[in-house]
From Swiss-Prot:
Signal peptide: none
Subunit and interaction comment: Binds GvpA.
Lineage: Bacteria, Bacillati, Cyanobacteriota, Cyanophyceae, Oscillatoriophycideae
Name of this chain's protein: Gas vesicle protein F
The keyword Metal-binding appears for this protein: no
Gene that specifies this protein: gvpF
Gene Ontology biological process terms, A to Z: gas vesicle organization
Family per similarity comment: Belongs to the gas vesicle GvpF/GvpL family.
Length: 244
């Protein structure tokens, strides 16, 4: 039993039926043209979908399949968006935001979003920071085994934190220097885990991704085993498709 329509994204052109065989709940995916905008959708079995790994992957896979077929300009919609009627889309989205939607399509045309997430080993970096600063290491070692007052604890903690932060910023600056000038736009987001030190998305010309990927690989080789770099070269442009 269906209770509405599950929406995946908006395109500036019709998407052929059958391009994506299955979407959420194994339902076939279709497109609906409304006032010049093509909405990718499938029948919804629920009014609200939990953000399970299976559902999230399916949502992303639908958009990626369409992108791989050549429909690369799109505005992805958030996971779990279910509507009752197309009239609600017109009233709540198209009518109030039509100009902004067209501006976003113009901005994203011929562009793609890629992203990097950089991880390091916190404990290794802490030890390396101390080894690179003999004076700090000597001061830290001299305090070990002693009953320190709060002021002393804060003092040595701040010195160590500042040293580690400089190492982190030096790494991040390498990525900025070598990648930012290749992008039309860069958005840096907060790290998502304790061992993640950098999280950035880049809007780049579609055909320049291979060159961008080579730059990421060169940086990876520069740092060797010190870093783990997670590079995503095919993702719907969530970061750059925000309605203001």
């Amino acid at each position: 039993m269906t209770v509405g329509l599950y929406l995946y994204g908006i395109f500036p052109e019709p998407i052929p039926d059958g391009l994506v065989l299955q979407g959420i709940d194994n339902e076939p995916v279709h497109s609906e043209m409304i006032d010049g905008f093509s909405f990718l959708y499938s029948a919804a079995h629920k009014e609200k979908y939990l953000a399970s790994r299976r559902y999230l992957i399916c949502h992303e896979k639908v958009l990626e399949t369409v992108m791989e077929a050549g429909f690369t300009t799109l505005l992805p919609l958030r996971f779990g968006l279910v509507i009752k009627t197309w009239e609600s889309v017109t009233e709540q989205l198209i009518t109030p935001y039509k100009t902004q939607l067209k501006e976003l399509f113009a901005k994203l045309s011929g562009q793609r979003e890629v992203s990097i997430k950089i991880f390091w080993d916190n404990q290794w970096e802490l030890q390396a920071a101390l080894e690179s600063n003999p004076k700090l290491k000597q001061e830290r070692d001299a305090m070990m085994g002693k009953n320190l007052n709060m002021e002393e604890i804060i003092h040595i903690g701040q010195l160590i934190e500042a040293t580690v932060l400089r190492r982190k910023q030096d790494i991040i600056q390498v990525f900025r220097d070598q990648l930012n000038h290749r992008a039309q736009e860069v958005i840096e987001s907060d790290p998502m885990t304790d061992d993640m030190i950098y999280n950035a998305a880049y809007l780049i010309p579609w055909e320049q991704e291979p060159e961008f990927s080579q730059n990421v690989e060169a940086i990876d080789q520069q740092f060797g085993d010190r870093l783990r770099i997670r590079y995503n070269n095919l993702t719907a442009p969530y970061t750059f498709a925000q309605l203001i």
